[in-house]
Amino acid sequence: MEIDKELAPQDRTVTVATVLPTVPGPSPFTIKQPFQSEVLFAGTKDAEASLTIANIDSVSTLTTFYRHASLESLWVTIHPTLQAPAFPTTVGVCWVPANSPVTPTQITKTYGGQIFCIGGAINTLSPLIVKCPLEMMNPRVKDSIQYLDSPKLLISITAQPTAPPASTCIITVSGTLSMHSPLITDTST
């Protein structure tokens, strides 16, 4: 049985994204702003942390008055303190997308996860830097919609059984934000 007519006529609108023209006009003015935040004082006890970068206070404060914000660069630094030589501390770090089910206990089972011994007689006392592979996750931390795959940092700390009274290392997150499209808000208060 053949059907000679179209039962439900279809609109012939072109909807392929590469064919649609871009909105005319200049690119938005972009502001680049560095940030750094202390996220953990470690070494006095065992600890685990899972930090979504968009939720870090310094990042959310900087992006408050902008509609769009992306990470240009991002890294974690482990800074040994004067307690480190006498009280070595094991620090594990791993960058994953925020929606990843990976937990801090799975750092060595995850691509890019690293474990460091901070302090001790023969270990490094220099700061250690681990860069976030932004090309492997979404660098957008603020937009008109919420993304679930922006960077998240997993941290695992194993302290000495006889831990010191003060931290053996300080962990900071640093980077550069690119922000544009200021929000129209009342700034008179």
Curated annotation (Swiss-Prot):
InterPro entries: Tymo_coat, Viral_coat. The keyword Magnesium does not apply. Its main location: virion. GO terms for molecular function: structural molecule activity. The keyword ATP-binding does not apply. SUPFAM superfamilies: Positive stranded ssRNA viruses (SSF88633). It is found in: Virion. Keywords: Capsid protein, T=3 icosahedral capsid protein, Virion. One of its GO terms (cellular component) is T=3 icosahedral viral capsid. Self-assembles to form a T=3 icosahedral capsid composed of 180 copies of the capsid protein. The capsid encapsulates the single-stranded RNA genome. A pentameric unit may be lost during decapsidation. Belongs to the tymoviruses capsid protein family. This is Capsid protein. It comes from Turnip yellow mosaic virus (isolate Australia). The lineage of its organism: Viruses, Riboviria, Orthornavirae, Kitrinoviricota, Alsuviricetes.
